[in-house]
Swiss-Prot record:
Homodimer. Part of the ribosomal stalk of the 50S ribosomal subunit. Forms a multimeric L10(L12)X complex, where L10 forms an elongated spine to which 2 to 4 L12 dimers bind in a sequential fashion. Binds GTP-bound translation factors. CDD domains: Ribosomal_L7_L12. This is Large ribosomal subunit protein bL12. The lineage of its organism: Bacteria, Bacillati, Actinomycetota, Actinomycetes, Mycobacteriales. Keywords: Ribonucleoprotein, Ribosomal protein. PANTHER family: 39S RIBOSOMAL PROTEIN L12, LARGE RIBOSOMAL SUBUNIT PROTEIN BL12M. Pfam families: Ribosomal_L12, Ribosomal_L12_N. Forms part of the ribosomal stalk which helps the ribosome interact with GTP-bound translation factors. Is thus essential for accurate translation. The gene is rplL. NCBIfam families: L12 (TIGR00855). GO terms for cellular component: cytosolic large ribosomal subunit.
């Protein structure tokens, strides 16, 4: 098979429908054992001064951190998939297995409390910061 240039590949992808592209991505992920999902959470690097300023104000954004899955890992994985949008089964399992991990970042207090309640009901240990 002749090697296709990046430009030729992009032209070929441009002709595909969204359904065909979705099927291609799934097949690519399976063949090469990779994932095209965006990272769930990325910790922001910040200095001490902004943290001190935030502490002086009333906190309006919260992070939900999965500390441990507990004994009911399958239930926790289901809840993680429910509260973290766009997460596949494998990604949710990897996230739960890799605890402690941040699940949600910079969400409203109500959303953080709701996620914490659901995760704790499933048997997980969760902190909200």
């Amino acid at each position: 098979m002749a090697k296709l240039s990046t430009e030729e590949l992009l032209d070929a992808f441009a002709e595909l429908t969204l359904l065909e592209l979705s099927e291609f991505v799934k097949a690519f992920e399976e063949k090469f054992e990779v994932t095209a999902a965006a990272p769930v959470a990325v910790a922001a690097v910040g200095g001490a001064a902004p943290a001190a300023a935030d502490a002086a104000e009333e906190q309006s954004e919260f992070d939900v951190i999965l500390e441990s899955a507990g004994d009911k890992k399958i239930g926790v994985i289901k809840v993680v998939r429910e509260i973290v949008s766009g997460l596949g089964l494998k990604e949710a399992k990897d996230l739960v297995d890799g605890a402690p991990k941040p699940l949600l970042e910079k969400v409203a207090k109500e959303a953080a409390d709701d996620a914490k309640a659901k995760l704790e009901a499933a048997g997980a240990t969760v902190t909200v910061k």
